[in-house]
């Protein structure tokens, strides 16, 4: 049976509304991966379940193991929960995000968490384009609420700045990684299964190119295609 999915090109960003496992064979290679895969938690918190619907394909941390095997030539950055650290391939280092404006978080856990972790895997061609960065990032939580596990643009931009070449996010969500790439003048490939979040991502990335404070040119044309597998 032939399956179809949407492909949209906005500037240097190529976006797919599809399952990442279907798109991966179509991508020859990437330089870097920056992603926040499903946590296997069904909802963002037990405190306000009614605010968000369930996350598509949020069915366990097999996705994290898969994401770390992507052949990124430069680097791979994967956000994860602390209790999933022992289920994954050993990273080269661990980056800690300290939330300046932390909250009570998931009430099922003993402590209110002020931090989240990001795993770093070094590719064979890895180097830092600027000075060697620290392994701690201090950044406020986002107030946008486009997605239940959305990361702040400042946080993702800090990590994207450490990459070179084409950046890939197989779990794009509401498109924060793509927005960061648009702002920083980097090429981006993103995949999102949920059509609603995909549309939000497209709108945010298009807007990022149009904002006057950016040093990259706006896209001359937005292309949309329907691809068959």
Give the residues covered by each predicted segment.
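Replication-associated primase and helicase/ATPase modules
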Residues: 214, 228-229
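Conserved SAM/SAH-binding loop
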Residues: 17-22, 218-227
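Core catalytic lobe of class I
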Residues: 4-189, 194-199
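Short, conserved SAM-binding/catalytic segment
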Residues: 2-3, 8-10, 202-217
């Amino acid at each position: 049976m032939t399956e179809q999915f949407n492909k949209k090109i906005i500037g240097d960003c190529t976006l797919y509304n599809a399952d990442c496992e279907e798109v991966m064979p179509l991508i020859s290679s990437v330089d870097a991966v920056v992603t926040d895969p499903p946590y296997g938690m069904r909802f963002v918190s037990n405190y306000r379940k009614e605010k968000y619907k369930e996350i598509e394909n949020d069915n366990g941390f097999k996705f994290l193991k898969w994401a770390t095997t992507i052949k990124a030539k430069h680097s791979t950055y994967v956000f994860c929960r602390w209790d999933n650290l022992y289920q994954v391939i050993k990273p080269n280092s661990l980056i800690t995000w300290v939330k300046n404006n932390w909250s009570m978080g998931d009430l099922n856990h003993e402590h209110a968490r002020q931090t989240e972790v990001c795993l770093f895997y070094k590719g064979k061609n890895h180097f830092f384009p600027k000075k060697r960065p620290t392994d701690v990032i201090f950044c406020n939580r986002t107030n946008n609420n486009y997605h239940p596990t959305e990361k702040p643009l400042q946080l993702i931009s800090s990590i994207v700045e450490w990459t070179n070449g084409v950046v890939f996010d197989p779990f794009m969500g509401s498109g924060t990684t793509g927005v960061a790439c648009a702002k920083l003048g980097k090429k981006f490939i993103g995949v999102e299964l949920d059509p609603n979040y995909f549309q939000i991502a497209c709108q945010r990335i298009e807007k990022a190119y149009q904002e006057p404070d950016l040093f990259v040119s706006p896209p001359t044309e937005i292309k949309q295609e329907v691809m068959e597998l």
